């Protein structure tokens, strides 16, 4: 897999023209596609301004004008593509997240603009059609609110926290806010996303007891101090995701 450093990105995508050409190559591969009628052609008209082409096309079939930004997160934004590309890079490279205040400082925009950019980026990287096959780790956690100790100092209350369920397979994570962590709710999420002949790996929480009725169920007995079961299965990856998520929240938000 090819990876790029920020310095490589700065050198390669140095100007707005560089960024536009890069985006056109990634989206169209040399054949611009009209977003209005779907016409694919190397011969759409290139419209110039003061003798210079700046990425505005006119469809040879429906005669509508378009740019490579249309149909992307960049549509309707007057920000240079270079700032968008840098924002995407910073968003993806900060595994614990990046705040709108920090992004604003990094790319020299207002906090309001950075907030808008981050929301567009998050919306475009989400995957609502995730499907999990083969081996899937599942776990639930509680996020947000203030942690309060119960009377007598025993345990911690989760009444002010929001339950979230997570599924992980082959590096893909799906997290969903759930009503509660009872069996009916947990199984509903699993049934929605996981293929029936798959292996589901969980801890020994009773909410997963019925998983074995529909899936190959591997249990890791955390309550016994076991974190890898006798067959080598674990839930370490999804738990690491929770850890990164919570650290990101602590580092960016005052309260969730």
Regions found by a protein language model. Give the residues of each.
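Residue-level recognition of single "structural anchor" positions
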Residues: 1-256
């Amino acid at each position: 897999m090819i990876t790029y450093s920020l310095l490589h990105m700065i050198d390669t995508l140095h100007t707005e023209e560089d960024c536009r050409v890069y985006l056109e190559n990634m989206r169209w591969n040399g054949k611009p596609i009209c977003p209005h009628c779907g016409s694919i052609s190397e011969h759409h008209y290139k419209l110039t301004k003061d003798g210079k082409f700046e990425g505005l096309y006119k469809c040879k079939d429906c005669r509508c004008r378009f740019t490579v930004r249309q149909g992307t997160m960049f549509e309707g934004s007057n920000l240079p593509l270079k700032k968008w590309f840098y924002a995407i890079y910073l968003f993806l490279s900060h595994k614990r997240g990046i705040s709108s205040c920090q992004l604003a400082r990094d790319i020299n925009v207002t906090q309001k603009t950075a907030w808008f950019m981050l929301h567009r980026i998050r919306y475009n990287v989400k995957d609502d059609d995730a499907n999990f096959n083969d081996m899937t780790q599942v776990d639930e956690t509680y996020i947000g609110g203030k942690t309060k100790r119960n009377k007598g100092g025993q345990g911690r209350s989760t009444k002010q926290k929001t339950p979230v369920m997570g599924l992980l397979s082959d590096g893909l994570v799906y997290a969903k806010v759930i009503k509660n962590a009872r069996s009916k709710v947990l199984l509903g999420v699993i049934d929605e996303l996981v293929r029936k002949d798959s292996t589901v790996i969980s801890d020994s929480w009773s909410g997963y007891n019925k998983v074995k009725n529909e899936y190959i169920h591997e249990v890791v007995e955390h309550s016994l101090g076991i974190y890898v079961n006798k067959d080598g299965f674990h839930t370490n990856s999804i738990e690491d995701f929770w850890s990164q998520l919570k650290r990101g929240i602590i580092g960016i938000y005052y309260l969730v």
